[in-house]
Amino acid sequence: MKMLKKGTAVLFVMIMAVMLVACGDKEETKTYTLSQNGVDSKLTYTYKGDKVTKQTAENTMSYASLGVASKEDAEKMLKATSDKFQGIDGLKEKIEYKDDKAIETLEVDYTKISSEDMNKIPGMSSNGDTSKGISMEESAKMIESQGYKEVSK
């Protein structure tokens, strides 16, 4: 009987340890910005520990930076690229056209998107094996090397 109580106590302690570790990582965000060639880009990463769970990109592009003169010309130019983002589970993309600029919002939910679909996304770059998740630390290094600056909270 004592052996059963010891076994139960050990099992209980192990379960509690696993639960504490699982609950230990809280979700956080980091935001980075870059202005280059008439495009203002804002990247927001949502992550737990070192694992990125979601990335949102907001790109504001003046029509002049796209080499077009009007909203209609911008729509024609960007439609083919925008169409490539549609219908992928874990990915949302939309473009809002204003009088003098287009605002693209792209959201990648890494808990839903497959690594195969992720590799198909135009303009998406990564280092290493993405099937095991996306590292926040490695993502920060990569985008900072491209000129992005972290926004202080």
Could you tell me what each predicted segment is?
Residues M19-A22:
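C-terminal motif of bacterial Sec signal peptides marking the signal peptidase cleavage site
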